């Protein structure tokens, strides 16, 4: 023991420690014999980084010794999970905190302009052609779901991906996503004349969601995917910062822990890089990586065409986007050109875009053009990256994404914080480090077909000004029925107009409750090919299609029809179907006798009568 104590003491005495640290060292010095050489190295790093305060409250040897070792386990984790380690984290933090204190504008020197991209109209020839190309490319793609969040903000205590996307079938978001990927795989392999290729599916989890995500997958047999296709990558939190010197915050509940908070979904890039998956995919001939977030029930309707755009235009980065009203609370995709010649195409948050435009020769700021929309399309955080250039970029950055810091200051002097802060990063900021030669574009699709996130609880949604999107479980479910109704309309079905109803204080359009499995209708041309004759669906109807080869011909539906078909069975659905159907019954979100996932919608489905065809 004496020799390890001597060597540890020697290591510490070799440090160039100035007087500032002296007061904190006795507590550490007394405990050095407890530490391994690696832990002594970590202590050395912390002292060199000006973090001696972390040891000020350490007890005498023999008291809390296990907690002291656990402290270094945490430090080792924080050091290894961040590109460049804690030294890099603290150096970056000091720079960003100094900029924040000075009020530096990250956009100084940049002039915004409208980038180039593809604006698609659902169902026209160009759209159909891009969809076809996208399905062909899908077997060369990997899908990455960023799912680190709980549903607390929604008034739901589970993980967000376990929430039903719609309650007609009760299909949760994760099941819906996996079934779309499986349908894409099957369709893409069929076009390529082979059946072996599997599409990789990665889920980024967090401490909050990891175990429950595993349980959801395992208890549902991975929703039909092979377990080997699915990889979970868990993101670690980052250290909190107490002041402008980036002193690490001590956890208020345990003096032997550093307080930590989530770093943001930008971590997905570093996790993919360190996992080795990207190289494996590249060696297997993959070309694309698609990133998407956890609660948008429409996004896969937009993916085939967007992937087709990436392949046709040879984009290194393709951001999916929707038309955006000027000043709408959604980031705008913008080209920024610096006075030094640098340029990049990135998402600029809506509260930064208007002042940036006003400051750079656009006196009116962010305004709608002749189309009725802002020329800067709305970012919906779904990205398609070309794998080769992605690997090339990450080999330079190790997946580190340009970060930001958002301290809440106590007063105008900006010398102290109301509470600890931390560095954050966003997945969509990946293009910030790309060279000007990178081909960065976007694909715009109508909101009704591409974007219906579920992120607000009923109380917050009810306060949203009329005409603005609620982004609640209520509006998210109604958006799925609306999209499916409009797709069938475009395919020639007479779908009745919606009726207005109020649930949980939100006025929504209630369309016929139409749902289908992805394998029935992955693309518009496929859906169109399965509809013949004169079909009509009344406003109170529900149509559920669970099968691939289901054909609608001269169907008149007024009520509820569920069509179940085995994999290879061909089912023709014809004639008139009339029954009492299923109704929507309002429920109050405060009624705790109703399950959370139902009451946050404000309605439950009352299944009175239906016809099933098998």
Swiss-Prot record:
Per its record, the protein catalyses:
a monosaccharide 1-phosphate + UTP + H(+) = a UDP-monosaccharide + diphosphate
Which domain of life does this protein belong to?
Answer: Eukaryota
Q: Transferase as a keyword?
A: yes
Q: Which UniProt keywords apply?
A: Nucleotidyltransferase, Transferase
Enzyme's top EC category: transferase
Which GO terms label this protein's molecular function in UniProt? Answer: UDP-N-acetylglucosamine diphosphorylase activity; UTP-monosaccharide-1-phosphate uridylyltransferase activity
InterPro entries, from UniProt? Nucleotide-diphossugar_trans, UDP-sugar_pyrophosphorylase, UDPGP_fam
Which co-factor is required?
Mg(2+); Mn(2+)
Gene3D superfamilies documented for this protein: 2.160.10.30, Spore Coat Polysaccharide Biosynthesis Protein SpsA, Chain A
**Entry similarity comment:** Belongs to the USP family.
Q: What is this protein called?
A: UDP-sugar pyrophosphorylase
| Originating species | Cucumis melo
The gene coding this protein: USP
């Amino acid at each position: 023991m004496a020799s390890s104590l001597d060597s540890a003491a020697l290591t510490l005495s070799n440090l160039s420690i100035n007087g500032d640290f002296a007061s904190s060292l006795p507590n550490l010095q007394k405990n050095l014999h407890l530490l391994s050489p690696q832990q002594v190295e970590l202590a050395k790093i912390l002292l060199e980084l000006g973090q001696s305060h972390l040891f000020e409250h350490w007890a005498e040897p023999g008291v809390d010794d296990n907690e002291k070792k656990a402290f270094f386990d945490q430090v080792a984790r924080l050091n290894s999970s961040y590109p460049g380690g804690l030294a890099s984290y603290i150096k970056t933090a000091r720079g960003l905190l100094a900029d924040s204190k000075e009020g530096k504008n990250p956009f100084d020197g940049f002039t915004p302009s409208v980038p180039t991209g593809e604006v698609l109209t659902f169902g026209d020839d160009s759209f159909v052609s891009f969809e076809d190309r996208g399905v062909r490319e899908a077997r060369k793609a990997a899908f990455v779901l960023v799912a680190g969040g709980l549903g607390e903000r929604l008034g739901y205590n589970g993980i967000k991906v376990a929430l039903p996307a719609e309650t007609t079938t009760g299909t949760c978001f994760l099941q819906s996503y996996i079934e779309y990927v499986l349908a894409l795989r099957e369709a893409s392999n069929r076009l390529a004349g082979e059946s072996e290729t599997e599409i990789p599916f990665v889920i980024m989890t967090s401490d909050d969601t990891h175990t429950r995500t595993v349980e959801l997958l395992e208890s549902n047999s991975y929703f039909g995917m092979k377990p080997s296709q699915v990889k979970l990558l868990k993101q670690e939190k980052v250290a909190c910062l107490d002041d402008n010197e980036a002193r690490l915050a001590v956890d208020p509940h345990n003096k032997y822990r550093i307080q930590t908070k989530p770093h943001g979904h930008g971590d997905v890039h570093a996790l993919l890089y360190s996992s080795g998956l990207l190289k494996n995919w590249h060696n297997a001939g993959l070309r694309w990586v698609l990133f998407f977030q956890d609660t948008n029930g429409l996004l896969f309707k937009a993916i085939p065409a967007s992937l087709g755009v990436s392949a046709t235009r040879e984009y290194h980065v393709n951001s999916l986007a929707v038309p955006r009203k000027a000043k709408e609370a959604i980031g705008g995709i913008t080209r920024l050109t610096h006075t030094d010649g640098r340029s990049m195409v990135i998402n600029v948050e809506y509260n930064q875009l208007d002042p940036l435009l006003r400051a750079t020769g656009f006196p009116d700021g962010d305004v709608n053009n002749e189309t009725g929309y802002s020329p800067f399309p709305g970012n919906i955080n779904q990205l398609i990256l070309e794998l080769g250039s992605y690997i090339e970029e990450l080999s330079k950055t190790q997946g580190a994404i340009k970060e930001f810091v958002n301290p809440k200051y106590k007063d105008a002097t900006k010398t102290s914080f109301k509470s600890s802060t931390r560095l954050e990063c966003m997945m969509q900021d990946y293009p910030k480090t790309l060279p000007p030669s990178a081909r960065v574009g976007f694909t715009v699709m109508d909101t009704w077909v591409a974007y219906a996130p579920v992120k607000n609880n009923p109380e917050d949604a009810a306060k949203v000004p009329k005409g603005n999107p609620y982004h609640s479980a209520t509006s998210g479910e109604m958006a799925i029925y609306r999209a499916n109704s409009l797709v069938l309309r475009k395919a020639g079905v007479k779908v009745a107009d919606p009726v207005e109803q109020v649930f949980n204080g939100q006025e929504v359009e209630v369309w016929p409750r139409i749902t289908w499995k992805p394998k029935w209708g992955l693309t518009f041309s496929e859906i169109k090919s399965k509809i013949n004759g004169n079909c009509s669906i009344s406003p109170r109807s529900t149509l559920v299609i669970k099968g691939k080869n289901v054909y609608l011909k001269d169907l008149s539906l007024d009520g509820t029809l569920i069509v179940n078909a085995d994999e290879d069975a061909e089912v023709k659905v014809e004639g008139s179907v009339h029954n009492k159907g299923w109704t929507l019954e309002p429920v109050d979100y405060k009624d705790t006798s109703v399950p959370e996932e139902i009451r946050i919608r404000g309605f439950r489905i009352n299944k009175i009568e239906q016809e099933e065809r098998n």
